[in-house]
């Protein structure tokens, strides 16, 4: 077994066929087929099933793929550790997170990061927790800023901030005259919430269950930027992070209220693959988050 065979095996899985893998690696289909046959012969098990020009992983293949990811990640880390020094001249950093985090918290961090490291190429991907975690595990994203908790047996998680969730409504809503609401005020009130599956939605659902609120969820959205205009026109109220409505509150287009006696918070954390050595661009943004996070407005005045 050699690295080239593992590279071919991984390319087949990612490309979906021997033909596409050959195109990606610039080798013939027959050469790839021959190497996979040798690999399976050496392992003594079948790792790929061929059917109608498609390939599927066997259980042994799934195990091998997991270790392939680890092997190539370790090699990449080794090369980085050997070649990098403390001065970043060039490189890239891939960041992922939820829409509210990427819209309202991350820009301040990235502006300062770019000022300090202008030659680092930055890529930002938005998504809910599960897709972002999958991208981190597949080495498609270097770092995620996610609502905690997350399943972390293979990940490094550093809690960075706790932000308050508030009830948000149109200024014309009957509840908008108050700065604090009781739990009972939420009973049967039309709610527009984040979609199921997001960690922020889970926090809200747990609060609803614990307080025995009769929830009237009329809509669910994946994007806070869609939720806000629906609330603005009076379709319902919502529960979202305060940081996402700072501008609207200042402009008077949305009103917010706390829940009396039951403040609702979500914790955000930095999520990365466990590794012996963090690439310098990744080290720098972790440090920057810790430096700047206290300067960001995430709690109501």
Question: What do the predicted segments below correspond to?
Answer:
Residues 176, 190-211, 278-287, 292-301:
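Secondary-structure junction motif
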Residues 105, 255-298:
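A late-sequence structural motif
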Residues 40-59:
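A short LG(V/I)-centered, amphipathic sequence patch enriched
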Residues 128-141, 146-147, 200-255:
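Hydrophobic hinge/microswitch elements
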């Amino acid at each position: 077994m050699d690295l080239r065979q593992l590279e071919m095996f991984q390319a087949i899985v990612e490309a979906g066929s021997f033909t596409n893998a050959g195109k990606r690696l610039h080798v013939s289909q027959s050469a790839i087929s021959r190497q996979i046959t040798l690999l399976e012969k050496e392992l003594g098990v079948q790792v790929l099933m061929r059917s109608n020009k498609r390939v599927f992983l066997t259980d042994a293949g799934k195990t091998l793929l997991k270790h392939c990811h680890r092997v190539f990640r370790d090699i990449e880390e080794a090369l980085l550790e050997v070649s990098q020094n403390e001065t970043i001249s060039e490189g890239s950093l891939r960041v992922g997170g939820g829409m509210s985090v990427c819209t309202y918290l991350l820009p301040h961090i990235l502006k300062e990061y770019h000022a300090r490291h202008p030659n680092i190429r930055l890529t930002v991907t938005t998504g809910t927790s599960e897709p972002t975690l999958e991208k981190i595990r597949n080495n498609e994203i270097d770092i995620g800023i996610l609502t905690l908790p997350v399943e972390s047996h293979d990940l490094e998680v550093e809690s960075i901030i706790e932000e308050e969730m508030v009830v948000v409504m149109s200024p014309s809503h009957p509840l908008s005259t108050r700065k604090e609401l009781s739990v009972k005020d939420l009973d049967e009130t039309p709610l527009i919430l984040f979609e199921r599956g997001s960690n922020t939605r889970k926090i809200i659902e747990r609060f609803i269950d614990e307080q025995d609120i009769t929830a009237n969820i009329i809509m669910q959205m994946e994007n806070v930027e869609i939720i806000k205009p629906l609330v603005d026109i009076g379709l319902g109220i919502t529960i979202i992070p305060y940081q996402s409505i700072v501008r609207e509150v200042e402009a008077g287009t949305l009103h917010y209220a706390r829940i009396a006696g039951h403040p609702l918070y979500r914790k955000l954390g930095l999520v990365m693959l466990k590794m012996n050595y963090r690439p310098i661009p990744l080290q720098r943004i972790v440090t920057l988050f810790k430096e700047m996070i206290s300067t960001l407005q995430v709690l109501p005045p």
